[in-house]
Swiss-Prot record:
Protein name: Urease subunit alpha
PTM notes: Carboxylation allows a single lysine to coordinate two nickel ions.
Subunit structure: Heterotrimer of UreA (gamma), UreB (beta) and UreC (alpha) subunits. Three heterotrimers associate to form the active enzyme.
GO BP terms, alphabetized: urea catabolic process
Catalytic activity, reaction form: urea + 2 H2O + H(+) = hydrogencarbonate + 2 NH4(+)
Species whose genome carries this gene: Synechococcus sp. (strain WH7805)
Temperature remarks: Optimum temperature is 45 degrees Celsius.
SUPFAM superfamilies xrefs: Composite domain of metallo-dependent hydrolases, Metallo-dependent hydrolases
Gene Ontology MF terms: nickel cation binding; urease activity
Span of the signal peptide: none
Family: Belongs to the metallo-dependent hydrolases superfamily. Urease alpha subunit family.
PANTHER family membership: UREASE
CDD domains the record matches: Urease_alpha
Length: 569
């Protein structure tokens, strides 16, 4: 006779199962388990008197015979493709199984073999997501990497050379010399990295040189002059060399209006940064570009979500980042032209509709590198409160909304930048870049961050204590982030042209270099759960935003979850 236990007791022991629901942190977002891949009665769990013991849940299978290096037991996976309970097997730094772990000699339905060489990570009672991907990094200081990792980000892409004036304003690593130095600096940083060259040139030679030197993309920024000529030249080089182009358009409309930029793009794939416009771009209507099928639109997190403080903090941020002088009226007018409550409010709704596809940070250049995931789910919460359930959801859960928003910081930036074969989702064959969260701290404080199959960051107590848990407990780097363990766990993304020129040997790099690919064929339709193409217009007098004729407006949030309740200092 099978032994029956209550649903509550089961969830407390093995984690929630099909039909169970839970709240994410202090938000109004409710998650419901769609499927459980484990087998009732044959679940695996580690510990004294538990299942993963020799001859029980642990087989005699050696690593060479198929046993995994690590098993994450009973994890609740939240990814764009589903919300499921499963065991996850890791081997050689990759995800090799999502299903039922254990001993096939004694248990039913085993798809992930646990052996004497298998380490166990307890996933029961935890949410498992793919490591976050931030594709709008100003590499101003190396301390950003630890801050990002502590928030659940495992891949950072952008540009910069340190606290140079150009880097403070623009996401570019200009020229072969600086690209080489940044690729060498990446050797000691425990995340995947990729660097954008400067895309502002009207002829191709200097752009091609940067791509051959190791740039994985090119960035067009108005502070360097984003004219129709530079847009066309940059995209032409990108099409030939298969790298992505990111663009910060012309706020002042000096070289043309948004229609002229769209014409210069000529239907080619492009990633538009801070597409609402407060971070920069054609004033007041760059936001309409999100309705173009070839445009991959993203937001940066200072406008996520729209709150009572958003407008006030932006002016000073903008003046500092873009080297403006508050004593010059024209500089102040430039800054003020970018900050519009109407377009920021509309941005919230366009994210909820799936018309904006990606959220990134704009680190130390009007954005906060450690708040990408937090701001993403604050936006989801605000939209749930203000707009109610999505049509695809029900009164029981917000599953579709949760999948839509997790896609904005995982799979969609990976697809946009040609790295989705390696990272961006919890799928077999991909790098084991994974984040475990306690549900009560989801989106604000990861419990464990796994990078390439090794733990690189975790909540940890006093190192002199007799057990791991006495306070002060806070996030700390772990063994996977040190020594020669770091290089095999991380990827450096470059161009195919750089791989052909043997950039790894030329620069003496130990990390694996990986070429981005298929960046020019991806369109908005490829972006998961965020491919809506509304016809967007902006009233030039009032700045009101309309999508398919409907006014998009919402009130600023007065209070947000994932905020001071969790961050007292």
């Amino acid at each position: 006779m099978p032994y029956r236990i209550s649903r509550q007791a089961y969830a407390e022991t093995y984690g929630p199962t099909t039909g169970d629901r839970l709240r994410l942190a202090d938000t109004e977002l409710i998650l419901e388990v769609e499927k459980d891949f484990t087998v009732y009665g044959d679940e695996v769990k580690f510990g004294g008197g538990k299942v993963i013991r020799d001859g029980m849940g642990q087989s005699q299978t050696p690593r060479a015979g198929g046993a995994v290096d690590t098993v994450i037991t009973n994890a609740l996976i939240l990814d764009w493709w589903g919300i499921v309970k499963a065991d996850v097997g890791l081997k050689d730094g990759r995800i090799v199984g999502i299903g039922k772990a254990g001993n096939p000699d004694t248990q039913a339905g085993v798809t992930i073999v646990v052996g004497p060489g298998t380490e166990a990570i307890a996933g029961e009672g935890h949410i498992l997501t793919a490591g976050g991907i931030d594709t709008h990094i100003h590499f101003i200081c190396p301390q950003q990497i630890e801050t990002a990792l502590a928030s659940g980000m495992t891949t950072l892409m952008g540009g910069g050379t340190g606290p140079a004036t150009g880097t403070n304003a623009t996401t570019c690593t200009p020229g072969a010399f600086h690209i080489g130095r940044m690729l060498q600096a990446a050797e000691g940083l425990p995340v995947n990295l990729g660097f954008f060259g400067k895309g502002n040139a009207s002829t191709p030679e200097a752009l091609e040189e940067q791509v051959r030197a190791g740039a994985c993309g090119l960035k067009l920024h108005e502070d360097w002059g984003t004219t129709p000529a530079t847009i066309d030249a940059c995209l032409s080089v990108a099409d030939r060399m298969d790298v992505q182009v990111c663009i910060h358009t012309d706020t002042l409309n000096e070289a043309g209006f948004v229609e002229d930029t769209i014409a210069a793009i000529k239907g080619r794939t492009i990633h538009t940064f801070h597409t609402e416009g407060a971070g920069g771009g054609h004033a007041p209507d760059i936001i309409k570009i999100c309705g173009e099928a070839n445009v991959l639109p993203s937001s940066t997190n200072p406008t996520r979500p729209y709150t009572r403080n958003t407008l006030e903090e932006h002016l000073d941020m903008l003046m500092v980042c873009h080297h403006l002088d508050p004593r010059i009226p024209e500089d102040v007018a430039f800054a003020e032209s970018r900050i519009r409550r109407e377009t920021i409010a509309a941005e919230d709704i366009l994210h909820d509709l799936g018309a904006f596809s990606i959220i990134a940070s704009d680190s130390q250049a009007m954005g906060r590198v450690g708040e990408v995931i937090t701001r993403t789910f604050q936006t989801a919460h605000k939209m749930k409160v203000q707009r109610g359930a999505l049509p695809q959801d029900s009164s029981r859960n917000d599953n579709h909304r949760l999948k839509r928003y997790i896609a904005k910081v995982t799979i969609n930036p990976a697809l946009a930048h040609g790295i989705s074969s390696e990272v961006g989702s919890i799928e077999t064959g991909k790098l084991a870049d994974l984040v475990l969260w306690k549900p009560g701290f989801f989106g604000i404080r990861p419990e464990v961050v796994i990078k390439g199959g090794s733990i690189v960051w975790a909540q940890m107590g006093d190192a002199n204590a007799s057990i791991p848990t006495p306070g002060p407990v806070h996030g700390r780097p772990m063994f996977g982030a040190f020594g020669k363990a770091l290089a095999p766990s991380c990827l450096t993304f470059v161009s195919e042209a750089a791989m052909d020129s043997d950039i790894q040997r030329h620069l003496g790099l130990e990390r694996t270099c990986m070429a981005v690919k298929d960046t020019r064929s991806v369109g908005k339709s490829a972006l998961k759960l965020n491919s809506a193409l509304p016809k967007v217009s902006v009233d030039p007098q009032t700045y009101e935003v309309f999508a398919d004729g409907e006014l998009l407006t919402c009130e600023p949030a007065e209070v947000l979850p994932l905020a001071q309740r969790y961050l007292l200092l």
